[in-house]
């Protein structure tokens, strides 16, 4: 999967602001591009989705009745008509670029015109609390397989196969990594700062977790202690079980952080303990919204019940999220490359769009 960083020139952000403003925790911006061919059912479909942290903020779908870059959250609606016109035009240009690219790569891989194929690109940046780049990303995939990725040093590429090495040589000759690095260290972070400022009421909020511990007997000799954290934002959180003050990381069952359906998150960590020794175990909770870490124990007199409704709601949202990702990205898994030689690519000229430049696929 690939991400390409936004490259629009920011006129409203001063250098002084960039150097003095700080943000709690780290933040990220990602763009996901997906092009899907569909023989016999019209032109290939092209979709762009943009995220700041976990929040989708823009969307473009070439299948729309009147394709335009569309807002997906209130704070991005602050951008004026010029922003939306520019972003729409770039997405329309990318639509044609990816359609040509699909045909080009199909030929390189010696694939028939009957099959459906995908090109995906993911790009973006992570920003630290000091407002500077933590890490940049730019990756490309074809038919569900990694193709070419910008390395963490932002100056070299990793090719997945011999076909991708052809592209790598072309991009190295075009000094594409230098262009990507300039964007990721500059405009990508600048736009992310701008979006964080415009959406600070939601993007920079810190909702502390609601926490409790539940007890679940397994047998006469063992029980499960489950440490719950509910209703928190942002998603980053640490739950650690300790026995007599020593971490029990190896023995802890930890689920992935889940959306709760109300723009907050849920998570739990569980440990199996000998019956009668429950009070030797504590759960340590660390989150940006807490003034200091919490230490929890199971309280037998106030046995908590599992919040089934909340968990089901969270899982329902997770299913919806997966469905959206399936439209945008998971089609990668639908087909696997049939082999052959890889496509040839060249880096497109930089633009001053919030989306940044995109890859150009050439014959």
From Swiss-Prot:
Residues 334-363 are cytoplasmic. SMART domains: IGc1 (SM00407). The chain crosses the membrane at residues 309-333. Residues 207-298 are annotated as: Alpha-3. Residues 115-206 are annotated as: Alpha-2. Keywords: Disulfide bond, Glycoprotein, Immunity, Membrane, MHC I, Signal, Transmembrane, Transmembrane helix. Residues 25-114 are annotated as: Alpha-1. It comes from the Eukaryota. GO terms for biological process: antigen processing and presentation of endogenous peptide antigen via MHC class I via ER pathway, TAP-independent; antigen processing and presentation of endogenous peptide antigen via MHC class Ib; immune response; positive regulation of T cell mediated cytotoxicity. It holds the Pfam family MHC_I_C. Residues 336-363 are annotated as: Disordered. Glycans are attached at residue 110. GO terms for molecular function: peptide antigen binding; signaling receptor binding. It is found in: Membrane. It is a single-pass type I membrane protein. Residues 1-24 form the signal peptide. Residues 209-297 form the Ig-like C1-type domain. PROSITE patterns: IG_LIKE, IG_MHC. Residues 299-308 are annotated as: Connecting peptide. Involved in the presentation of foreign antigens to the immune system. Belongs to the MHC class I family. This is Class I histocompatibility antigen, Gogo-B*0201 alpha chain. It comes from Gorilla gorilla gorilla.
């Amino acid at each position: 999967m690939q991400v390409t960083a936004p490259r629009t020139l920011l006129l409203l952000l001063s250098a002084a602001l960039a150097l003095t403003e700080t943000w709690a925790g780290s933040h990220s911006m990602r763009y996901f591009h997906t092009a899907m061919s569909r023989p016999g059912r019209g032109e290939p479909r092209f979709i762009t989705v943009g995220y700041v942290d976990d929040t989708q903020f823009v969307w473009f779908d070439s299948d729309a009745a009147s394709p335009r870059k569309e807002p997906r959250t209130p704070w991005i609606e602050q951008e004026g008509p010029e922003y939306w016109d520019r972003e729409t035009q770039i997405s329309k240009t990318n639509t044609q670029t990816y359609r040509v690219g699909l045909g080009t790569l199909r030929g390189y891989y010696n694939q028939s015109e009957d099959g459906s194929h995908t090109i995906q690109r993911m790009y973006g940046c992570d920003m630290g609390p000091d407002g500077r780049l933590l890490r940049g990303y730019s990756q490309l995939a074809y038919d569900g397989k990694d193709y070419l990725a910008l390395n963490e040093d932002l100056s070299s590429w990793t090719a997945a196969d011999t076909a991708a090495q052809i592209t790598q040589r072309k991009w190295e000759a075009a000094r594409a990594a230098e262009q990507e690095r300039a964007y990721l260290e500059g405009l990508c972070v600048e736009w992310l700062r701008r979006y964080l400022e415009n959406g600070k009421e939601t993007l920079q909020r810190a909702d502390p977790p609601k926490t409790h511990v539940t007890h679940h007997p397994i047998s006469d000799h063992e029980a499960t202690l489950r440490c719950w954290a509910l209703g928190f934002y942002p998603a980053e959180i640490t739950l650690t079980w300790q026995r007599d003050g020593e971490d029990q990381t190896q023995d802890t069952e930890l689920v992935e952080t889940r959306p709760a359906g109300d723009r907050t998150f849920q998570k739990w960590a569980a440990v199996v303990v000998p019956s009668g020794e429950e009070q030797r175990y504590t759960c340590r909770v660390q989150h940006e919204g807490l003034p200091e870490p919490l230490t929890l124990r199971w309280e037998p007199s106030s046995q908590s019940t599992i919040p089934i409704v909340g968990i089901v709601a969270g899982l329902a949202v997770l299913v919806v999220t997966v469905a959206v990702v399936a439209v945008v990205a998971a089609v990668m898994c639908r087909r696997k490359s049939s082999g052959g030689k890889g496509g040839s690519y060249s880096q497109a000229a930089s633009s001053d769009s919030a989306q940044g430049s995109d890859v150009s696929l050439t014959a």
